[in-house]
């Protein structure tokens, strides 16, 4: 039978952890100064006046490499617990992990063939 009172501490933690950031934003909005002078609108470069254009555009290639990094970072997050409990889980979980890695390899090869990893 599913008993909800077993999760009381979870709900208390969820409510408190949601309330603290909201409270922090409200307090900073109330206590923060509201002046919008020229110093507030200028960009900050190591305490000196900025020279040249302070707004630079990043090349889209940086985002592609960051996206590929996130994919393999998520793969690590999923495969590490699996590797730590490999002897307990059995063959079916091994096949699922193998299919997961195979899908990631196929996606990486596809991105490589399409030129997503080229820097030109």
From Swiss-Prot:
Catalytic reaction equation(s): a plastoquinone + NADH + (n+1) H(+)(in) = a plastoquinol + NAD(+) + n H(+)(out); a plastoquinone + NADPH + (n+1) H(+)(in) = a plastoquinol + NADP(+) + n H(+)(out)
Gene Ontology BP annotations: photosynthesis, light reaction
Membrane topology: Multi-pass membrane protein
Keywords linked to the UniProt accession: Chloroplast, Membrane, NAD, NADP, Plastid, Plastoquinone, Quinone, Thylakoid, Translocase, Transmembrane, Transmembrane helix, Transport
GO cellular component annotations of the record: chloroplast thylakoid membrane; NADH dehydrogenase complex
Keyword Transit peptide applies: no
E.C. number: 7.1.1.-
A GO molecular-function descriptor: NADH dehydrogenase (ubiquinone) activity
Location relative to the cell: Plastid, Chloroplast thylakoid membrane
Matches recorded under Pfam families: Oxidored_q4 (PF00507)
Keyword Plastid in annotation: yes
Broad EC category: translocase
Transmembrane segments: 9-29, 64-84, 88-108
Function statement: NDH shuttles electrons from NAD(P)H:plastoquinone, via FMN and iron-sulfur (Fe-S) centers, to quinones in the photosynthetic chain and possibly in a chloroplast respiratory chain. The immediate electron acceptor for the enzyme in this species is believed to be plastoquinone. Couples the redox reaction to proton translocation, and thus conserves the redox energy in a proton gradient.
Subunit relationships: NDH is composed of at least 16 different subunits, 5 of which are encoded in the nucleus.
Family that this chain belongs to: Belongs to the complex I subunit 3 family.
Protein name, as recorded: NAD(P)H-quinone oxidoreductase subunit 3, chloroplastic
Organism expressing this protein natively: Glycine max
């Amino acid at each position: 039978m599913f008993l909800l009172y077993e999760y009381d501490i979870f709900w208390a933690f969820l409510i408190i952890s949601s309330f603290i950031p909201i409270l922090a934003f409200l307090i900073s909005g109330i206590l923060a100064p509201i002046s919008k002078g020229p110093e507030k609108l200028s960009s900050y470069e190591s305490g000196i006046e900025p020279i040249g254009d302070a707004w630079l555009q990043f090349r889209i290639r940086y985002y592609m490499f960051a996206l590929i990094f996130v994919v393999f970072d998520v793969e690590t997050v999923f495969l590490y617990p699996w590797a730590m409990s490999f002897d307990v889980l059995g063959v079916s979980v091994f096949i699922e992990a193998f299919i997961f890695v195979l899908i990631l390899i196929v996606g990486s090869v596809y991105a490589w063939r399409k030129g997503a990893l080229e820097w030109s």
